[in-house]
Amino acid sequence: GDTYLYENPWTLPLGFILPDIVETGWKRDLSSPADVQNDLSDVLGVPECLIFTDGEEQGNRFSFTAPEDGEYYISVANRQIDSVKLDVGGESRSIDTLKRGYLVETGYVKAGTLILLESNDSAGSMDASAYRFDEAGLRALYERLNQHPFELETLGEEAMKGTIDA
């Protein structure tokens, strides 16, 4: 079969220095992983990576229409819901183990595409939110985190040596 190799231009080094505000100001216990990610961006003073997108929730269903082309994610805050059906423009798939609290990835969708998430569990409202991934936000976050990188000098089986300019 065909093999594809992609370059990730925003790979962080083994280590880097974070400003003190990250330890004291970053809220890591928010109910949505998207909110945790965006709070890190806010604390570091860079644009958010995940842009909130309006959606509508009715019972065990959450839906939204993509306002622009992009990669979208859905956060389900109700941790009692474990299994959902995702429908993106008429193509459906099942997603299990949602209780772990990860984001549901819709993939790249065109503007005007209807996205529907339906719970298979009878656990009440999903309390769902949709987000569009913003590449410029990720680039800004990467650049902020990579301001003081760990420069690896040597790497052995039991140790590594390097420097960080602070």
List each model region and its residues.
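Flexible, solvent-exposed extracytoplasmic
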Residues: 1-166
